[in-house]
């Protein structure tokens, strides 16, 4: 492994709460992070993210909005397993929407294997066309930033 940690924010800033990951990494970029940590905004460039991960990392933290049936604004940390390549599977890339599952599937199909992968997800309230986060998701930003900082410093967050 490379000894690096990658924190990647993904999402579409033109689909309201889908911009959650982008906003979290924007706020994180204003704060100090431990040595070896890269904080990047990948926006809707999930394919670029998958290729970046092929360089290897010990810890990968993906920050994104994800509909999980929770109350809007709920922040959840999940441990994610990168799937093994499936030669019989169809295409894993949807040019219009690359979900967290799609990013991990693409990474697996390319043979990428981060040491540990976490998803810091926020339940969206509104992913309609428009700019700006909904109230519940905007209010969740400080908690999400603290959560990622705790992950990076090895504090009490567990997946």
Model-inferred region functions:
Residues 124-126:
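Short, internal active-site loops enriched in acidic
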Residues 148:
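Hydrophobic "lid"/C-terminal helical patch
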């Amino acid at each position: 492994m490379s000894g690096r940690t990658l924190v990647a924010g993904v999402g579409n800033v033109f689909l309201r709460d889908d911009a959650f990951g982008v906003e979290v990494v924007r706020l994180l970029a204003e704060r100090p992070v431990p040595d070896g940590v890269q904080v990047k905004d990948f926006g809707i460039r999930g394919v670029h993210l998958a290729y970046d991960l092929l360089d290897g990392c010990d810890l990968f933290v993906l920050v994104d909005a994800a509909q999980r049936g929770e109350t809007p604004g709920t922040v959840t940390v999940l441990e994610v397993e990168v799937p093994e390549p499936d030669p019989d599977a169809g295409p894993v890339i949807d040019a219009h929407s690359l979900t967290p599952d799609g990013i991990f599937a693409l990474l697996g199909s390319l043979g990428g294997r981060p040491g540990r992968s976490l998803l810091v997800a926020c339940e969206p309230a509104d992913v309609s066309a428009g700019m700006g986060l909904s109230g519940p998701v905007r209010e969740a930003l400080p908690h999400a930033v603290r959560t990622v900082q705790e992950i990076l410093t090895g504090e009490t967050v567990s997946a």
